């Protein structure tokens, strides 16, 4: 009360919680002058409160006809119906519910209806989690662009290895050839070398100068 009297002497409006003495002054004013004309209530009641604060205190806390407790089923249906039509205009909705305050209607919608609506709209969690995990771990084949093309020198190595294997097989099978043929040059001895040189000509990245150097080799000495 000391704070309120000091604020009144200085002409300031008091904010914050109401005291018991202020509640009594507001009750007496409403009983004498009735509800309405809230602009003159602070002056008539001798309160350093704004008209909005006086109206809010009376309608939500001090009015004798206020009904406390849980909302029944009919009241809940009515609130839902009116909220679809009026939106968040709580004062209009509460005015149509006898004994219910604006605060009670607003708090009920915020704590019950909105919460229930948000829970119902939450999507159900996925049940087949193993399928999701295994599908994400499946290795994907590499694209055709990522497959490495063999280079020209790799082709040469493969060709040389193949010819080396063919030469070994010919040496193993040549143990039974006639003794008279020793020392004679096989006319087809250079077929493998010709085939190898032809493969080199087909490689686009092989330089022309290097190909001529290969052709200058002594073919007979190379295969001797």
Curated annotation (Swiss-Prot):
Domain HTH myb-type: 10-66, 67-117
Subcellular localization, as worded in the UniProt entry: Nucleus
InterPro entries: Homeodomain-like_sf, Myb_dom, Myb_TF_plants, SANT/Myb
GO molecular function: DNA binding
CC terms in the record's Gene Ontology section: nucleus
Main location: nucleus
Family annotation (CDD domains): SANT (cd00167)
DNA-binding region: 38-62, 90-113
Pfam families (UniProt xref): Myb_DNA-binding
Claim: Transcription is one of the keywords in the record: yes
Keyword Zinc belongs to the record: no
Induction of synthesis: This recessive y allele is expressed at low levels, resulting in an inner white flesh of the beet. However, yy plants still can make pigments but never make as much of it or have it in the same location as YY or Yy plants with an inner red flesh.
Keywords: Activator, DNA-binding, Nucleus, Repeat, Transcription, Transcription regulation
Leader sequence segment: none
Described function: Activates DODA1 and CYP76AD1 in the betalain red pigment pathway.
Protein name (database record): Transcription factor MYB1
Naturally occurring in which organism (per UniProt): Beta vulgaris (Sugar beet)
Upper lineage: Eukaryota, Viridiplantae, Streptophyta, Embryophyta, Tracheophyta
Gene field: MYB1
């Amino acid at each position: 009360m000391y704070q309120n009297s000091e604020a009144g002497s200085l002409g300031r409006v008091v904010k914050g919680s109401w005291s018991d003495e202020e509640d009594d002054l507001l009750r007496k004013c409403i009983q004498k002058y009735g509800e309405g004309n809230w602009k003159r209530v602070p002056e008539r009641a001798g309160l350093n409160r704004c008209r909005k604060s006086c109206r809010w205190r009376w309608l939500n806390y001090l009015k004798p006809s206020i009904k406390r407790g849980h909302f029944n089923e009919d009241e809940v249906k009515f609130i839902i119906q009116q909220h679809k039509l009026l939106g968040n205009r709580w004062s209009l909705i509460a005015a149509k519910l006898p004994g219910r305050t604006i605060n009670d209607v607003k708090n009920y919608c915020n704590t019950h209806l909105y919460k229930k609506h948000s829970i119902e709209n939450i999507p159900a969690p996925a049940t087949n989690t193993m399928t999701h995990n295994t599908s994400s771990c499946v290795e994907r084949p590499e694209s055709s662009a990522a497959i490495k093309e063999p280079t020209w020198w790799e082709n040469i190595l493969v060709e040389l290895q193949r010819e080396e294997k063919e030469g070994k097989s010919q040496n193993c099978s040549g143990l039974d050839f006639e003794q008279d043929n020793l020392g004679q040059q096989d006319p087809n001895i250079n077929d493998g070398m010709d085939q190898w040189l032809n493969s080199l000509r087909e490689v686009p990245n092989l330089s022309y100068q290097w190909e001529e150097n290969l052709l200058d080799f002594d073919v007979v000495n190379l295969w001797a």
